[in-house]
Amino acid sequence: KIIVEKDPVRTSFEKWAQPGHFSKTLAKGPNTTTWIWNLHADAHDFDSHTNDLEDISRKIFSAHFGQLSIIFIWLSGMYFHGARFSNYEAWLSDPTHIKPSAQVVWPIVGQEILNGDVGGGFQGIQITSGFFQLWRASGITNELQLYCTAIGALIFAGLMLFAGWFHYHKAAPKLAWFQDVESMLNHHLAGLLGLGSLGWAGHQVHVSLPINQLLDSGVDPREIPLPHEFILNRDLLAQLYPSFSEGLTPFFNLEWSKYSDFLTFRGGLNPVTGGLWLTDTAHHHIAIAVLFLIAGHMYRTNWGIGHSIKEILEAHKGPFTGEGHRGLFEILTSSWHAQLAVNLAMLGSLTIIVAHHMYAMPPYPYLATDYGTQLSLFTHHMWIGGFLVVGAAAHAAIFMVRDYDPSTQYNNLLDRVIRHRDAIISHLNWVCIFLGFHSFGLYIHNDTMSALGRPQDMFSDTAIQLQPIFAQWIQNTHALAPSLTAPNATASTSLTWGGGDLVSVGGRVALLPIPLGTADFLVHHIHAFTIHVTVLILLKGVLFARSSRLIPDKANLGFRFPCDGPGRGGTCQVSAWDHVFLGLFWMYNSISVVIFHFSWKMQSDVWGSINEQGVISHITGGNFAQSATTINGWLRDFLWAQASQVIQSYGSSLSAYGLLFLGAHFVWAFSLMFLFSGRGYWQELIESILWAHNKLKVAPAIQPRALSIVQGRAVGVAH
């Protein structure tokens, strides 16, 4: 059955050229400056353009193609910079002494000071994106390949742009297609994840592995055969991996162990590059592909066999859960906000897990010894994960306000959660109070004892110990596990677990067992505190999005509103939007502590140089365990010790970071202006300025208005 509608919407440049064409009110044009804010707020709020779920679904689907085309353009730019402006080939020939750079600043008003010496006679800005390491792992050996990939990405960007137009204006899917979840699961699991992983595994085996094997052996990149030569000439591969000479025979004979020369199960890191064994990662991608190809055949479509999501959900009942998951299928196929909320929560958590794996199991060659890149990747993935998790709460709240129909959700799990929301929130609040007082209480105790000169009464590894015994037990079991579960593995999954192994590359520590002590125990409970407060704010926003004792008719006021009218004091900052706004601040809080912890811990206990005698000199000399047990220690030995280097960077090639540091604090202070000043103050000021303009007969046609309360908060939180 074909579920596509032909030519549903005319392509009209005249319509698109009119700002606000998606809304009757906005299309009339501006009366006041509020118009431009509403334009930004509603341009992508497809719910406000139409009530037709089919049209909304098509717009989202089309927008996804637009998003993909932007991603391809961005990627193309990265690869083009690598091809045109970088020292990639030099770095590839000597990655331990030459730093990655892909940007050379033009000599305008002395800015060329930013071009530091990155080694190999190249002057430029050191980059910390990890692209060089990724390219090496992919088997890219010269700049021509980067050019080709950049051009390929632009072609794909064009294709995506075309697809976005085509599937909205020429052949738009009907609503039934968007709601056919079993078919969608099969195709996404088997196609995207299954065949995607298999394709990547194929590239790794036929291109990446042989090229990296030769690079690791010290062969000049210019002498290594090109990718197509490995793909077309099996004998070339057989020289490196003998099992290639047997072709697919062992596969069909079930003698799979013959392939263990290029599909390994080693564990640990490659001592040459300090990255995971690429033969391990190729093996991993084949295993993942098999799993997802099977998963992509599990759901019932045309043949009457397999799982039905609706049946699974409706059968999901426990003795104390009433109607269980009945009604959730209808929610997830008719509310894209609900669907998005679940996906964002999952993807956000996964992104944070990725942040931790990037340093514990560094996947690319020479990544572990590039400390700036390690720090950047950790920070990047933590922030992205944080935004996605807050986004999950935002869309869950929008679902509650716009899409939730209480009459169809009686006594199922969602209804039951909403009915005992007071118990959930008050318990969560108690947990936050407990964690806050106890975690900070331990720090305050330590600061006081330190100030009174009583170090023997402090909580630290050298006085009253609070060892994280459960974390240490987990570390220990993981370090010992492979000897039982994977007897052929040479090391555990990550060197961080323990076991005494250390990998260093070019005299720099790649990774070693990370010791955990009292300082980690203390800061861990600060993490627990900040995360629980974030969850408290966000969950309260979702569970009270439709109604509360204070405002029983909140659902009628919408997702965002400043206050419940002038007649009711004390009802400001209660909208679901405001909870997202406040939750964002606590998310920022949480992530700051995490990044501080990671940054100092790694510099103190992991990163550093190692001499011929095997003596390690850590960057901050192992001061974390003693200093991180007091607030004063954090301020003096981490924040000031590190920030002062940035502040004193003027006049050196690092000065951009000093200026960014200054600028970031300026932006932060600027945000407070929007958060702490009332709307009326600005309106009064504007009217006074307007009076002067009128006096001189230069009054604007569009009447200036102060930002609304919600707009001011949006600007504040963004800055």
Curated annotation (Swiss-Prot):
Single GO term (MF): 4 iron, 4 sulfur cluster binding
Broadest EC class assigned to this enzyme: oxidoreductase
Annotated binding of chlorophyll a', by residue: 665
Membrane spanning residue stretches: 60-83, 146-169, 185-209, 281-299, 336-359, 375-401, 423-445, 521-539, 579-600, 654-676, 714-719
Record field: catalytic activity: reduced [plastocyanin] + hnu + oxidized [2Fe-2S]-[ferredoxin] = oxidized [plastocyanin] + reduced [2Fe-2S]-[ferredoxin]
EC number(s) recorded for this UniProt protein: 1.97.1.12
Membrane topology of this protein: Multi-pass membrane protein
UniProtKB keywords: 4Fe-4S, Chlorophyll, Chloroplast, Chromophore, Electron transport, Iron, Iron-sulfur, Magnesium, Membrane, Metal-binding, Oxidoreductase, Photosynthesis, Photosystem I, Plastid, Thylakoid, Transmembrane, Transmembrane helix, Transport
GO cellular component: a single term: photosystem I
Cofactor: how and how many bound: P700 is a chlorophyll a/chlorophyll a' dimer, A0 is one or more chlorophyll a, A1 is one or both phylloquinones and FX is a shared 4Fe-4S iron-sulfur center.
GO BP terms: photosynthesis
Compartments, record wording: Plastid, Chloroplast thylakoid membrane
Binding site for chlorophyll a: 673, 681
UniProt keyword Membrane, yes or no: yes
Residues binding phylloquinone: 682
Residues at which [4Fe-4S] cluster binds: 563, 572
HAMAP family xref list: PSI_PsaA
Family: Belongs to the PsaA/PsaB family.
Functional note: PsaA and PsaB bind P700, the primary electron donor of photosystem I (PSI), as well as the electron acceptors A0, A1 and FX. PSI is a plastocyanin-ferredoxin oxidoreductase, converting photonic excitation into a charge separation, which transfers an electron from the donor P700 chlorophyll pair to the spectroscopically characterized acceptors A0, A1, FX, FA and FB in turn. Oxidized P700 is reduced on the lumenal side of the thylakoid membrane by plastocyanin.
Subunit structure: The PsaA/B heterodimer binds the P700 chlorophyll special pair and subsequent electron acceptors. PSI consists of a core antenna complex that captures photons, and an electron transfer chain that converts photonic excitation into a charge separation. The eukaryotic PSI reaction center is composed of at least 11 subunits.
Protein name (Swiss-Prot/TrEMBL): Photosystem I P700 chlorophyll a apoprotein A1
